[in-house]
């Protein structure tokens, strides 16, 4: 309850596209969708399919779209493919829907490098998954996201999915990160533990 109230208080005055949100509304509300990254039969990114998806999202009443999350298979795309995908989504949904960009790495140095080098024009926030495979301590998780926040030009959504990463962001670490920076604006909580949301 208190974390949700804190997040709402930090985002209430954040101004984004006025055609979607009125002043004093939270940055992202309603129903969002994590988009797939469509490919054609030859293994190339299907740009026309991205356009059709975006139109479907918009007409269907979706509130915001996550690009290059787990569903978008960002971990299997190379840098060039990611740039192509980013630009296509931005062009297709410009002045229509807010976009969240997934940027993640289990290396803090690499994550910061990716954030600093990625063209985030057209995106409203970055979503970054908890460091995976290495099973960091809670202090390690805090330092990972702290460094990302310090270099990021955009607000950051934490992404907790221990079933895939084998690491779990504790409630205390979430609160600590939220207290550290107003750029931490929320979390995608995919642990499946509903009591954590209630707490």
Predicted regions and their residues:
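Eukaryotic N-terminal low-complexity, Ser/Thr- and Lys/Arg-rich leader segments
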Residues: 8-16
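Catalytic alpha/beta core domains of metabolic enzymes, predominantly
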Residues: 164-199
């Amino acid at each position: 309850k208190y974390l949700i109230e804190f997040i709402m208080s930090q985002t209430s005055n954040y101004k984004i596209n006025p055609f979607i949100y009125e002043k004093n509304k939270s940055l992202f509300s309603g129903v969002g969708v994590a988009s797939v990254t469509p490919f054609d039969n030859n293994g190339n990114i299907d740009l026309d399919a991205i356009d059709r998806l975006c139109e479907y999202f918009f007409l269907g009443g979706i509130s915001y779209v996550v690009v290059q999350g787990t569903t978008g298979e960002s971990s299997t795309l190379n840098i060039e493919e990611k740039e192509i995908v980013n630009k296509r989504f931005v062009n297709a949904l410009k002045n229509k829907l807010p976009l969240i960009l997934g940027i993640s790495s289990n290396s803090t140095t690499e994550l910061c490098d990716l954030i600093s080098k990625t063209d985030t024009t057209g995106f409203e926030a970055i979503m970054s998954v908890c460091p995976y495979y290495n099973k960091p301590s809670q202090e390690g998780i805090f330092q990972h996201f702290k460094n990302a926040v310090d270099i990021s030009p955009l607000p950051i959504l934490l992404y907790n999915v221990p079933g895939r990463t084998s690491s779990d962001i504790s409630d205390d670490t979430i609160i600590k990160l939220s207290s550290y920076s107003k750029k931490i604006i929320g979390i995608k909580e995919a642990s499946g533990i509903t009591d954590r949301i209630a707490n």
